[in-house]
């Protein structure tokens, strides 16, 4: 499995990707050549978001015994660790990716990054995973498929 401390990803592909997930943007290794950073380092968000999504995809493929074919018809799901200011994260089939954001916590005054949460990143990954298996669910007018999507995201996280 991949994790924030994974070094084999970079050694296999300097663009930080697996066969099914790629990072939208660059991520440079630390001085030791690893992808482990303190939370104060901006690279922490990219490493956390990418590794959480890559782990979810790898675990699902291992469980299913088959490769995921994305509903976007793209080879790889793109992880965009910081898409701007908002308290949000979402999966967008048309863009072929997962988009995470940041904003200021009104109570603490600290910046919060949705991509730093393994639970949020994995939840969004499972929207893409379920969409790969059952793409018709996203176009349903019934409320049940939407609720099922949210449940799968929560279960996966």
Where are these regions (language model features)?
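Acidic/polar low-complexity interaction segments
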Residues: 1-62, 70-75, 131
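Hydrophobic (often cysteine-bearing) scaffold residues that line and stabilize catalytic clefts
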Residues: 49-53, 118, 149-152
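Transmembrane alpha-helical segments of multi-pass membrane transport proteins and ion-pumping complexes
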Residues: 59, 128, 154-155
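Alpha-helical scaffolds flanking conserved acidic
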Residues: 75-78, 115-118, 147-149
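Catalytic zinc-binding patch centered on the HExxH motif and its immediate surroundings
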Residues: 78-99
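Post-HExxH zinc-binding segment in Zn-dependent metallohydrolases
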Residues: 83-84, 143-157
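Short pre-active-site segment immediately N-terminal to the catalytic Zn-binding motif
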Residues: 102-121, 140
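Catalytic Zn2+-binding segment of zinc metalloproteases
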Residues: 125-140
């Amino acid at each position: 499995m991949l994790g924030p401390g994974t070094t084999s990803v970079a050694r296999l592909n300097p663009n930080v990707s697996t066969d099914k997930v790629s990072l939208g943007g660059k991520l440079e290794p630390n001085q030791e050549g690893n992808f482990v950073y303190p939370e104060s380092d901006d690279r922490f968000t990219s490493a956390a978001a990418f590794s959480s999504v890559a782990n979810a995809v790898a675990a699902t493929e291992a469980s299913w015994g088959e490769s995921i074919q994305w509903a976007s018809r793209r080879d790889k799901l793109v992880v965009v660790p910081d898409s701007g200011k908002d308290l949000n994260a979402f999966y967008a089939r048309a863009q072929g990716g997962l988009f995470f954001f940041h904003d200021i916590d009104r109570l603490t005054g600290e910046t919060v990054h949705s991509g730093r949460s393994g639970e949020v990143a994995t939840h969004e990954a499972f929207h893409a995973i379920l969409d790969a298996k059952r793409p018709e669910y996203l176009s349903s007018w019934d409320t049940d498929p939407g609720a099922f999507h949210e449940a799968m995201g929560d279960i996966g996280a």
